[in-house]
């Protein structure tokens, strides 16, 4: 199948290494995950090879799929304050959250010499967030 962008959003390990290579060979230049870990390890290796060779974009679920969790948190906040936000208000808040995630992930990747590598950037940004929280609470 030919596509420019693939959005695997169904199940874990939905795309294996051979399928990832086929996507790339057929012109796909971006995979943005909408499910929890829809690409297996071999697929991720294929994405990384394509990123290095041709600038392929791969946004892992841990960053790209954060929108569902964010909207759930917004809903809980809205409910606890007995508020009722419009679609536009929720969408605006979500866009801000997702832009912030992208900024943190891309900044972390660049800061540590992995510009364009959103897997490494997401891992580093996530680690920094947890480490900062532990330091702030005096756990380290």
Language-model regions: role of each:
Residues 9, 24-140:
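Adenosine-phosphate binding glycine-rich loop
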Residues 1-17:
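Rossmann-like NAD(P)-binding element
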Residues 21:
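Histidine/acidic residue-rich metal-binding segments in metalloenzymes
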